[in-house]
């Protein structure tokens, strides 16, 4: 797994080693692009506001396409009002979203399609439970 950070100040919840172990377990060898809130090219005013505030309203904090996972995390260089506990309780924190996207990667490897959200969610939760995170 190759890690690409936007500004270098973004911190991965649980640490980089945990993220690498999760990716290795799922067989992901692509790039993880890490963006701080308010950074990155997602269009739309509502999405930009969500990145600034950390409130996603049903949107995840990560995105998958074959060979690339984008993750949005709170960054010290961004002015983000970020409630980590609220996202953690809803399983919408960046680590849970990353595990969910790894579920899409596993789907893509088996079926060459990655659109089944229920399977990805289940795989992500099982992966986190296996590593003792949840």
Model feature map: region roles:
Residues 32-44:
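A short acidic/basic microdomain associated with nuclease active sites
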Residues 2-13, 61, 90, 129-134:
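Long, well-structured alpha-helical subdomains associated
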Residues 91-96, 118:
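Alpha-helical scaffolds flanking conserved acidic
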Residues 113-134:
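Post-HExxH zinc-binding segment in Zn-dependent metallohydrolases
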Residues 96-109:
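Active-site recognition of the HExxH zinc-binding catalytic motif
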Residues 43-92, 105:
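Active-site scaffold of zinc-dependent metalloenzymes
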Residues 12-31:
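Zn2+-dependent metallopeptidase catalytic core
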């Amino acid at each position: 797994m190759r890690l690409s950070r936007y500004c270098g100040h973004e911190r991965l919840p649980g640490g980089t080693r945990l993220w690498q172990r999760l990716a290795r377990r799922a067989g992901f060898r692509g790039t993880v692009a890490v963006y701080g809130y308010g950074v990155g090219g997602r269009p739309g005013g509502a999405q930009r506001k969500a990145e600034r505030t950390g409130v996603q309203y049903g949107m995840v904090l990560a995105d998958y396409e074959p060979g690339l996972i984008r993750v949005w995390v709170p960054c010290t260089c961004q002015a983000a009002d970020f409630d980590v506990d609220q996202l953690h309780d809803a399983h919408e924190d960046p680590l849970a979203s990353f595990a969910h996207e790894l579920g899409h990667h596993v789907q893509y490897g088996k079926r060459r399609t990655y659109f089944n959200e229920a399977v990805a969610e289940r795989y992500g939760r099982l992966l986190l439970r296996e590593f003792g995170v949840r």
